[in-house]
Amino acid sequence: MLTDGKHRPGSVKMGYYALRFLFCNIYHKEWAKAYLPTPKVAKTLPLVLSQDEVTDVLGAIRNFKHRTAIMFIYSTGARVSECVNIRLTDIDSKRGQVNIQEGKGLKQRKVPLSPVLLSLLRSYFKKYKPQHYLFEGAGGKGTHLGVAAVREICKKARYGTPRIKKAYTPHTFRHCFATHHLEHGTNLLVIQRLMGHADLSNTLKYLHVQQLNPDQVINPLDKLNGLEGLCKDK
């Protein structure tokens, strides 16, 4: 698999770990990397839309509930699975925050509630009157919008945004949340907490996709004392 060129790096890596599991857990042998080198898997950068592109996509989503769900992801950085599982009790308008449950471990992170998102949700409540989950499913009370249904929202929106050639998905808006925060100057450690990343390296990847504004970059040479004299031929 390592040399025939017929398998994707991810498949090779899965085969590697399966073989190591068999060697260590079934045959109870000590594993050494010398037996087989760890396959290298190229890291791909996250797909990110510009803020103008985000506006175009949101404008292409006609259904108010569907548009609100995507705006919720973009405003909070929630994963799609976290978004659909948000309950009404997770929205704390008094403290101005959203409580996001992270997976099965029920670990929780608190994300600031944007004034724009809060206003949007109030309009949403008036129209849909959700009872339990914020984004209820077709079954009504006690059910929530499915992950596949949220993916379908973006799939349909792509037909309405032919100028955007990027194959964006709902998760793209989580990437946009982090990247646009960086572009607006939010501290990387703050973004790590907002995203729920246990490892900072998962957050660092957004440094590679952010668009740098030349007006925000201060060159250290420009801040030296005594520049006037240094820039003249003596």
Go through each PLM region and give its residues.
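Conserved catalytic core of the tyrosine transesterase superfamily
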Residues: M1-K234
